UniProtKB/Swiss-Prot annotation:
Belongs to the phosphohexose mutase family. GO terms for molecular function: magnesium ion binding; phosphoglucosamine mutase activity; phosphomannomutase activity. SUPFAM superfamilies: Phosphoglucomutase, C-terminal domain, Phosphoglucomutase, first 3 domains. The active site is at S99 (phosphoserine intermediate). Activated by phosphorylation. GO terms for biological process: carbohydrate metabolic process; peptidoglycan biosynthetic process; UDP-N-acetylglucosamine biosynthetic process. The modification Phosphoserine is found at S99. This is Phosphoglucosamine mutase. Binds 1 Mg(2+) ion per subunit. It comes from the Bacteria. Its EC number is 5.4.2.10. Catalyzes the conversion of glucosamine-6-phosphate to glucosamine-1-phosphate.
Length: 445
């Protein structure tokens, strides 16, 4: 049975993520990390979901039962776990979060001792241990060999210092008015402190988590409230994070939501202007708009494509010796400062770009026009191979003949089918999207 999806393990708390399942997974992961253990320490952080307590306690029980010492640091962004795992010299880091999913869901992400997400072969090795009954039941420690657990509440300071070091030393934010939407999630403590300490005039919204309101009509998936607040407050910029703050959505001074591909383009060129790029390559996923590739080419930069998921972006960056890349969805990686997408690092770089441009953000963050794109997330009841659907191949052939770029795939974390179409003719795009929706609704819903 496959346990891992495209971003760790994710499911409904109490249904897939039961205490028994989590304990078994924790033991399996712990035994895998034991093979290369240096410090016998594992770090655990979480977002603000109510079920995080249940999942955390199950993981602590599992890991200590096989002799690991566990450090619990409470609600922190996913990129903070990646950073602190290496910084605190732990064998591994674990983030308990379902990212942008509703509060009923939760998930578990693993990081190696260097702060990188696990490769697929590492996840498969953990899955093999998970299914090995004899190994699991023979691994419990007794007496003094049982591990310990301790909670540390002040590591947030380490991460704040790290974030501030990513911001250019010759700049400050005193001239900027910024609205932050922390999605009632993991960034609710750290984001306001970072921007305030760098001098910004800050307004914070959705920073009162109650365990059930994470991502609820707020944050990166629902930036309309942020847009309204930016206009009302006459702010220069607005930043919306998702539940675990590895994703960023930017709103300009006019209240417009800045497209993720425009962000990638303008930030890439900004990094080039500072001689901060390690190569001429910038990495993005197959969902990126063709206009991004054309814009980067005009700036003597090359776009490299990879599979969808920030861990694939990170891997492609390493293969191409690139230090900048990301996803249209707002997972943007500055690998000089973060091993994974970091919404706060990205927000600080956007702020620096706007400051140095000496332009309004609505101008500075709008470097090129996009080709019309249409993305639909369709709720599905089943996930058969798309190639097995009668008429599917003919649909794709027709799209190719009409020169409509297409990307159709199941979500790796939700019961959804993602349909992306791109073409120069917007009316044709809308017509074909409606046809596709009706086709898949008839087969999958």
């Amino acid at each position: 049975m496959k346990i891992f999806g495209t971003d760790g393990v994710r499911g409904k708390a109490g249904v897939k993520l039961t205490p028994m399942f989590v304990m078994r997974l924790g033991i399996a992961a712990g035994l895998y990390f034991k093979k290369h253990s240096q410090t016998n320490k594992i770090l655990i952080g979480k977002d603000t979901r109510k079920s995080g307590y249940m999942v955390e306690n199950a993981l602590v029980s599992a890991l200590t039962s096989i002799g690991y010492n566990v450090i619990q640091i409470g609600p922190m962004p996913t990129p903070a776990i990646a950073f602190l795992t290496e910084d605190m010299r732990c064998d591994a880091g674990i983030m308990i979060s379902a990212s942008h999913n509703p509060f009923e869901d939760n998930g578990i992400k693993f990081f190696n001792s260097y702060g990188y997400k696990l490769k697929e072969e590492e996840e498969k090795a953990i899955e093999e241990i998970f299914h090995d009954e004899e190994l699991l039941h023979s691994s419990y420690k007794v007496g003094e060999s049982i591990g310990s657990a301790k909670r540390i509440d002040d590591v947030i300071g380490r991460y704040i210092v790290h974030l501030k070091h990513s911001f250019p030393k010759h700049l400050n934010l005193q001239s900027l008015r910024i609205v932050l939407d922390t999605a009632n999630g993991a960034a609710y403590k750290v984001a306001p402190v970072v921007f305030s300490e760098l001098g910004a005039d800050v307004l914070v919204i959705n920073d009162e988590p109650n365990g059930c309101n994470i991502n609820e009509q707020c944050g990166a998936l629902h930036p309309n409230q942020l847009s309204q607040e930016v206009k009302k407050y006459r702010a220069d910029l607005g930043f919306a994070f998702d539940g675990d703050a590895d994703r960023l959505v930017v709103v300009d001074n006019l209240g417009n939501i800045v497209h993720g591909d425009k962000l990638l383009g303008v930030l890439g060129v900004y990094q080039k202007s500072k001689n901060a790029l390690s190569s001429q390559a910038i990495v993005a996923t197959s969902m990126s708009n063709l206009a991004l590739k054309e814009y980067l080419k005009s700036q003597d930069l090359e776009l490299k494509h990879c599979a969808i998921g920030d861990k694939f972006v990170s891997e492609c960056m390493r293969l191409n010796k690139a230090n900048f890349g990301g996803e249209q969805s707002g997972h943007i990686i500055f690998s000089d400062y973060a091993k994974t997408g970091d919404g706060l690092v990205c927000a600080l770089q956007v702020s620096a770009l706007v400051l140095e441009s000496k332009q309004a953000s609505s101008v500075a963050l709008n470097p090129f026009e996009l080709y019309p794109q249409n993305l639909v997330n369709l709720n599905v009841q089943k996930k058969p191979p798309l190639e097995s659907l009668k008429g599917y191949s003919a649909l794709l052939k027709e799209l190719d003949q009409l020169e409509i770029r297409h990307l159709i795939r199941y979500s790796g974390t939700e019961n959804k089918l993602r349909i992306l179409l791109e073409a120069k003719d917007e009316k044709l795009l809308e017509s074909k999207m409606q046809e596709l929706k009706e086709f898949f609704e008839g087969h999958l819903c």
